[in-house]
A protein has these predicted regions:
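Conserved catalytic or regulatory cores that recognize and/or transform ribose-phosphate-containing ligands
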Residues: 30-264
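Bacterial N-terminal signal peptides that target proteins for export
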Residues: 1-12
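Bacterial N-terminal signal peptides
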Residues: 11-22
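Boundary at the C-terminal end of the N-terminal hydrophobic targeting segment
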Residues: 21-29
């Protein structure tokens, strides 16, 4: 039912795209449907398919090299967009901080965390569907059963660590951070000029910043859920070989791990 629902929505999207392409001045890159091993289908830019394939192979090689070095491999799910008062560059720094914290906790000699905010993931002129095709292919691995030993979903405590929250006037700290950064970071200053307000920034990072409010993270959660469903149903894996899911560094309860979240 889930796949049929996805495909029906996708069919409508393809028809709408085709119709819009016929309007004057709508010179868009050609798109086509690509489906992954776990049954996720995306309407992607044909011009980016080769680039996406190259990126996927690059990430798979990184994973293989790190695993050959004896390391456990984790995937970091983190909100990166500036929706709702966030800032892309700040979120990127939080991702780097979270990756470093996880590797420090377990030991960098034995742990490697793939951070999707790496420059290697950039797709020139890529849209959401293009990025999701790339990351779905990376997450599911060559065999469609997952290429990671665990998934780490970033939560409020990961943001709190980055900002130095201590439970005493944390919104004040965000006000001070905002004022300092707008004076020292031209890109942040430009974001403010384009509409980012201190109030929205303060509310977002004090109350909302988490994979809970990230559309992409919702899709990644569902992908890992599907991978574990496939593993449970396959005799080569079984329940004992599911991919562990962590939120803010703590293991997710079985009932939660098997639950579907809203699509991004």
């Amino acid at each position: 039912m889930l796949l049929a629902h996805r495909l029906s929505i996708l069919t409508v999207a393809v028809l709408v795209t085709a119709a819009l392409a016929g309007w004057p001045g709508n010179a868009q890159a050609a798109k086509s449907t690509e489906c992954t091993k776990v049954g996720m289908c995306y309407c992607v830019n044909d011009d980016l398919k080769a680039t996406i394939a190259t990126r996927v192979e690059r990430f798979r090689q990184i994973i293989a090299d790190q695993r050959k070095a004896g390391k456990a491999i984790g995937y970091l799910s983190v909100p990166l967009t500036s929706t709702g008062g966030g800032n892309y560059n700040v979120n990127k720094e939080v991702a780097e901080s979270a990756k470093a914290a996880v590797e420090k906790r377990f030991g960098a000699d034995f742990m490697y965390v793939l951070n999707p905010a790496t420059p290697d993931s950039d797709l020139p002129k890529g849209g959401g569907a293009d990025y999701m095709l790339m990351w779905t292919a990376v997450l599911e691995g060559p065999d469609g059963f997952g290429d990671f030993d665990f998934a780490y979903f970033v939560g409020p405590q990961d943001f709190a660590r980055y900002f130095g929250f201590d439970g005493n006037g944390d919104m004040v700290k965000l006000d001070q951070y905002f004022d300092k950064r707008v004076k020292s970071d031209p890109e942040f200053e430009k974001a403010v000029q384009n509409g980012l307000t201190k109030a929205a920034f303060r509310r977002y990072y004090a109350l909302r910043a988490s994979t809970t409010v990230s559309r992409g993270a919702h899709d990644e959660w569902n992908i890992f859920r599907m991978l574990n469903e496939r593993r449970r149903a396959d005799s080569k894996f079984g329940t004992g070989s599911q991919i562990p899911v962590l939120f803010e560094g703590r293991g997710v309860a079985p009932a939660d791990a098997e639950a579907t979240v809203s699509e991004g």
